[in-house]
Amino acid sequence: METTRELSVVPQQGMMTKMGIINPTFIEDAVIVSEKKQEKEHPNFIESNTSGITLEELETNCIVPSFGDNQLTISHQTFIHRIEEAASIFFAGETFGNTEIRVSHKILGRHPSALTKRKEELKPEDETIYYQRMAFCFHIRTICREMNGEEVHLCIGGVRSLNEENLYGKKSPEKFKIFIGWRVRVCSNLMLTCDGLTGRLEVMGDTDIYIAALKLFREFNPEQNLRLLENLGRTMISQEQFCQIIGRLRLYQVLPASQMKELPKVILGDSNINAATKGYIDNPNFGLRGRAKISCWDLMQLLNEAAKQSY
């Protein structure tokens, strides 16, 4: 979200009158105007194919879909509220930034009174709407650290996609993802990269979301996590080592399934690996840039940038 521009006005007496420009009878004197720099609230979203929305718009303009047995799903806004409540309890006394929300895959319907109308005759009040996918996050402004020369704030949020639910059947556990970390990249189709902790939930009610969020926050050690990330910035990779990593990523894709199970899961395909290789050469932020080596931090960012191209 964009912060609003604020102007502070401070009167200073005597400035203009001492110069003999204005009669002191008519004016006290000048003002100094300063303007606060505008900054982007959240760089955390992969924004392609999504649009911003407010919590109020979710609550007033959108319906809540139900399962086949007419039991309601957990609404997007309820999901957001439960994570915010858990954060406000666990991080009591801290200052929170605005919650930014992005949605995609709009699902339209009609009120019964508009069933016989043609599409071009429909008015906004004739339609129902909900969004299949939603992601949100917010920063804790008072928990900030410097990482690799850049100030970062602790970030909390979640993402869910209703296309993972069988809305035609009876109510069943609903799927959500929540996260906490210093650097997060998230999009509405559940693609999530996070340097902290993430949790995949399958819950029957919103109370379970609240409990799971508190558990995730307790397990997260921000200082230890930050030290690990800083170590990434200090650990350098030669060109030979980078080529070995790329080669192993390609080899992973043709391993037998039994061997894959013994290794950490890799979600990068050929196109992502090619993008990371290209970024190694010409990415202005994380590539070689005339250097002989890059850091592990640069490598992580190159892979994150490559993963974004699939979404």
What positions do the PLM features span?
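Compositionally biased, flexible interaction segments
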Residues: 56-173
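Feature for intrinsically disordered/low-complexity regulatory segments and propeptides
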Residues: 1-84, 90-95, 101-103, 107
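Intrinsically disordered, low-complexity regions enriched in serine/threonine
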Residues: 1-43, 119-311
